[in-house]
């Protein structure tokens, strides 16, 4: 029976007079790939941050890997993120003074865990960069740097991988390679992926697409294609505020 890797129940997040999320209830089943889309300012990144424990909701509850986040101290929340969550962002956020393999090993070192070289090499092998293990970021292309960031996110074997516009800084061909890696990890490894994107082609790699408008869920698509996603987005962008 499939369980939920992440669950949000009636989550609201306000910043002063602005309501970024408004009574959002969503589940992200384990082993699935979900894309989150919506017009600019719809609450996509806020949803990801609340779901990942990077931001606390004003009201409502978030459960991550079976743990309710609301009652956790900042220290316990940080430990949970280190051990159970992976992150990939538009900016690669690699440390320039470290090699690819050292960047990948960093989450294990921060968590005080033993760094097995074979495990680091396996993570780089997964993303097709084993031969670049000793290269620093300055010697890697943008696509290669994002693949290192992906290997780093997966080194702790997280329950869920959150990706915020992971192809936003990449050219079309390189972006498709990264999306193919994400799709493959879901299919082969049962990895759970939640991805924020503005690109209908990127969203079509997912099992389903959840749409937000003005901080509220505004429907979803399963088995999406780029055309069906683009058509839905066109309609949503015409919704009056």
Ranges and model annotations:
Residues 37-39:
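The feature captures the beta-strand-to-loop junction immediately N-terminal to the Walker
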Residues 60-68:
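Conserved ABC transporter NBD signature motif
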Residues 69-86, 227-231:
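ABC ATPase NBD coupling module
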Residues 98-106:
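Short coil-to-helix segment of the ABC ATPase nucleotide-binding domain corresponding to the Q-loop/switch region
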Residues 136-146:
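Conserved ABC ATPase signature
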Residues 157:
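Conserved catalytic motifs of ABC-family nucleotide-binding domains
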Residues 161-164:
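Catalytic Walker B motif of ABC-type/P-loop ATPase nucleotide-binding domains
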């Amino acid at each position: 029976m499939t369980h939920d890797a992440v669950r949000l129940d009636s989550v609201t997040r306000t910043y002063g007079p602005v309501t970024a999320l408004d009574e959002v209830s969503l589940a992200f089943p384990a082993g699935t790939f979900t894309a989150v889309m919506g017009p600019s300012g719809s609450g996509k990144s806020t949803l990801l941050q609340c779901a990942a424990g990077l931001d606390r909701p004003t009201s409502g509850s978030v459960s991550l890997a079976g743990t309710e986040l609301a009652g956790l101290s900042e220290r316990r929340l940080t430990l949970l993120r280190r051990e159970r969550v992976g992150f990939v962002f538009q900016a690669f956020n690699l440390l320039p003074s470290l090699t690819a393999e050292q960047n990948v090993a960093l989450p294990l070192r921060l968590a005080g865990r033993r760094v097995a070289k074979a495990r680091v090499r396996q993570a780089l092998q997964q993303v097709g960069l084993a031969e670049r293990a000793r290269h620093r970021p300055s010697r890697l292309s943008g696509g290669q740097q994002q693949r290192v960031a992906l290997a780093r996110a997966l080194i702790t074997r997280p329950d869920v991988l959150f990706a915020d516009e992971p192809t936003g800084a990449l050219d079309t061909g390189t972006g498709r390679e990264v999306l193919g890696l994400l799709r493959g990890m879901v299919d082969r490894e049962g990895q759970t992926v939640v991805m924020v994107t503005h690109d209908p082609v990127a969203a079509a790699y997912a099992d389903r697409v959840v749409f937000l408008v003005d901080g509220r869920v505004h429907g979803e698509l399963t088995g999406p294609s780029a055309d069906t996603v683009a058509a839905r987005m066109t309609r949503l962008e015409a919704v009056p505020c």
